[in-house]
A protein has these predicted regions:
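Alpha-helical propensity feature that highlights long, continuous alpha-helices across diverse contexts
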Residues: 1-234
Length: 234
């Protein structure tokens, strides 16, 4: 019997060539998008809310294809609405997807109404106002792909979009908003589907990147032989 001793290395200890081999070996057996189920769930909810059917779509780390979008239960006049008429139609029918009710309490002090919060609202004659705010709460399925998919709707109707990094809504630049004014209802719905697959493609691209692989190696304590052969990774 022979006893063989093998030195194991962490990813950061490998040579550049060994790192490339490790990354390529991992990619060769990990083809599925980790968040593919979430993408499909968001797409299903988009189809339900908009009354559409999306078929023959695809995406990977290199690109995406929205496939064929069938507008079930729509008529040509609705799809052709443009400008302010399109904005009004989308707001009335789908605005609830991106804007949430928000309550403001006001009290009357010395004959004037002023904003109040908390217990103060109980001290004086009060009235309540409601408005709507884009809070980025992922209203379709609870994952970030919802916000990406609905951003075109929020942009067209309200001139806002959700900044995932800042975790807040931001105003869309005026030049971008004006370009949107020429779009039709059909354009906006198609943009929502396109935005979903664009986000999925970018997420898939990051998943396959060397940066993400290095993070996974560190988080999971993966080890390698000197030439980059993976020893204990899933």
């Amino acid at each position: 019997m022979k006893e063989v001793t093998v030195r194991l290395y962490e990813y950061d200890e490998l040579s550049d060539e060994a790192k490339r081999k490790a990354h390529e070996d991992w990619l060769s057996v990990n083809h599925e998008h980790f968040c593919g189920g979430e993408v499909r769930a968001t797409l299903k909810r988009l189809e339900e809310e908009f009354g559409i059917e999306v078929t023959c779509w695809s995406y990977d780390s290199y690109g995406y294809d929205c496939g064929t979008i069938r507008f079930e239960n729509w008529n040509d006049d609705q799809l052709a609405l443009a400008g302010e008429r399109a904005r009004a139609f989308l707001w009335n029918n789908f605005g609830h997807l991106v804007m949430r009710p928000r309550t403001h309490y006001y009290t009357k002090v010395d004959g004037k109404w002023r904003n109040c919060v908390g217990q103060e609202s109980r001290k004086y004659e009060s009235k309540v106002f409601f408005d709507r705010t884009y809070d980025g709460t992922c209203p379709l399925t609870g994952v970030c792909f919802d916000n990406d998919a609905l951003d075109p709707l929020a942009c067209f109707c309200f001139g806002v979009k959700w900044d995932e990094k800042a975790k807040k809504r931001v105003m869309v630049p005026h030049d971008e908003r004006w370009r949107w004014k020429s779009k039709t209802v059909e354009d906006v719905v198609r943009e929502c589907v396109d935005a979903l697959f664009e986000s999925a493609q970018k997420d898939c691209e990051y998943q396959d990147s060397e940066e993400h692989f290095a993070e996974m190696c560190s988080d999971n304590d993966w080890t390698f032989e000197e030439d980059g052969t993976i020893r204990n990774a899933a």
